[in-house]
Every structure is written in structure tokens, then in C-alpha cells.
């Protein structure tokens, strides 16, 4: 019986020696591995082997595995990864390539970290145990390195509220245990922030304002091992209450618009139509509604709640129209008064305006002319008054007795000196005299003649000569 077992064992060894090495030494590994630059990858691998001779190895012999890059000189120990403590990997791959599997358990899995573009190439596995040394050249692994396209992830609340602080987290879910942690940086258009970095993530605290709505915020991650960077950009949605509520008015078919303020008053002519557009700045958009006095109005178009079209039939009574903007964070309203006026009223108002303007202009012109005349008169010097004798100026004597004629002889009293002749070069002027008669005495009924003669006083008022 013992002899039979020995014969079977010898026959089995001879059978193994005669087999194809590919049937004795097998390896299962991915033939092509694609990985992005700066990242890491785990390549699963397992192998099998058999004894060719009884003296190849013993159960106590350790099992060593080696990963080589094709084209390297194995005689110079150019190993990329091994579990043999005596032999070390080359400097370029040290602390980046690891034989993660246990060859004792037929595990040859390879772990690669911080992959660089120059790592691309062909790799094969080598087994050493006792006298058995075998290179699995039939089962090579091709490593392809591409550009880094992975981006970080940003976690944030669905909506940010203006004036309230919020936390945002930037992380790299493809973290695979780098020798140095990644470097995080934040950039934003106008937002102010404070960040706190941890291994594999960064927490950002921001207090957004309404002007930050719609702006970009970027988280950038730099991998120190390869110095490659990747970034993620988001658009901020900041919730804020309504502001800058305005009403734009279009009169009739006119394309010219007018922006009205709260409390504005607008006269409306007879037969006129209006289009009122209410708008505000808020996020999410505020609910807009119109009311007339205390009556809520239906919007002209459901798709445009801020649009209100008013036709002459609506405007004949006028009134106060109010636009209300309602929002979860606050509300605003704006009111305007529409005053209908007939065409006659408008014409009278315009005529009154024109007449008033004309009268004002005429009064102003009259005052200006008068001031100019007075100013011109004051500038000319006054000439001395000269009286020229009138050709009909005679010595006159008036008798108190009407029955007695006046005598015009040389014995009469001379005229006052004011009647003296003026120089011939002076222009002749007209003088006026005032005749004053004394109270007449009663007539002598007895025919006696009064020997006393009464004369009248002739007064010439002195006139200033015209220049």
C-alpha cells in the first residue's frame, strides 16, 4: 500500500513537470486600468502556483511578491512594489505603490496613490518562494493615466437667507488617503466668508446679502502630491424681502413710459386708457396684486400679475390704485391717485395758464419800460425857466365900472418883470395867467363918477421849461 502511494506521488510530480507553465502559474488581474492624475486606485489581483519538484520550496518558506514596470532592469532591483523587507522599491514609486495583498494567501492586489502621468505603462507580477521564481509575463496590467476631471462636492442649504449666517461644506469623496491632505480654497464675487479646513473637507461660514444673489462661489482643491487642481462652482440663491417697488405707466398706445413713486397723483383726460406695470426686486419672486380703493382687482394676464390695463370705462371714476408685493420675508406697497378730467376742464386749465403767463409777462415788461424812462430822465440836467412875451400881451386895465371903458395909455402901470422878453434863441412857449377880480362895489345911482380905478391881479404860474 505504501509503495502504491509513493508511485502515485512520483507520477504526479512528473505530470506537473510536463505541464505548460501557464497551466501551473496563473494570475487574474485587470488587463487595463484607467485612473485620473492625482488620484489613487486599487487593482485586485490573485495568483496560483504549484511545485515542479519536491525541493522547490517548503511550507516554511516565505512567499514574496514583486510588481515590476516593463522595461526596468530587474537586476538593479528596480521594483515598484514588494512585500520583501530586504529589497526596496525605487524612489519614484516608494510610498505610492503598495503590494496591498498577502502573497501567502495568493493575493497580489496593488494599491497606487497620487498617480502621476509618468506612471502610465505596463506592469507585471513576480513570485518568489524557495527555489521557485516566476514572472507572470502572460498576464500584464496596463496603467492609463488621464487628466483630473473629478470635482469636489459642495453641500449647502437649499436657500440662503439674506443677513443670516450659513455653513457650506466642500469635500472630496474620492479621497484615498494621500500622504498630505488636499488644500482647499474659496473664491466668491462679493460674498465675505470665513473657512475652516479639515482632512478631506472644508467648512465655509457666509452671511450673504441681497446683492449676493445669483453670484458665483467656487471651491478649489489642490492635490499636493501632484500639484494638480480641480474646482466646483455654484450659483448662490439668496432669499430676500421685496425692495425697489415701482409702478411704470404707459398712456394709451404710447411706448414712452413714466415711473411713478408712492403717493403720486396723475390727471387722466377723458377717453384715455392706461397700462400699469408693477415690479419689485425679491427672491423668490414676490406675489403681486392690484387693488382699487378697497376692492381687489384681477390681473389683466395671469402670467403677468403685475400688469393692470385700465380702459376709459374703468377710469371715469378715478380713485386710488395700490400695488401690493407680498413675500415670506416681508411686503411692500405703492399707491397712486388717478383723477379723471374732462376735455373742457383741461382746456380751461390750459387757457388759464396761458392768460396768467401773458399778464405776468406784460406787467413785467411795463415795469421795465417805466424804470428805463425814469432812469433816462434823471440823467438829463434841467434848463432854467424862460418866459417869452406873447405878441398879444398888452397892458390891460379893468375898470370896476362896466360903463367906463379901459384906457390903454402910457400912464398905466407896467406889467410885472416876469413878462420881460427872453433871448431870441429861446423857443417860444405858452404861458397861462390867472385873473382875479376884487369884489365889485355897488354902482353910484346918482351918476357920480368914482375917481378911484381898481386893477385886477394877473398871476402867471411859473412853469419849468421842457428840456
Swiss-Prot record:
UniProt signal peptide: 1-18
Location(s), subcellular: Membrane
Superkingdom as given in the UniProt entry: Eukaryota
Residue sites binding N-acetylneuraminate per the record: 126
Residues carrying covalently attached carbohydrate according to the record: 46, 167, 197, 216, 227, 237, 244, 262, 287, 294
Domain Ig-like C2-type: 152-239, 242-339
Membrane topology, record value: Single-pass type I membrane protein
Residues with Phosphotyrosine modification: 432, 455
Domain Ig-like V-type residues, every copy: 21-141
InterPro entries: Ig-like_dom, Ig-like_dom_sf, Ig-like_fold, Ig/MHC_CS, Ig_sub, Ig_sub2, Ig_V-set, SIGLEC
Protein name in UniProt: Sialic acid-binding Ig-like lectin 12
Organism: Mus musculus (Mouse)
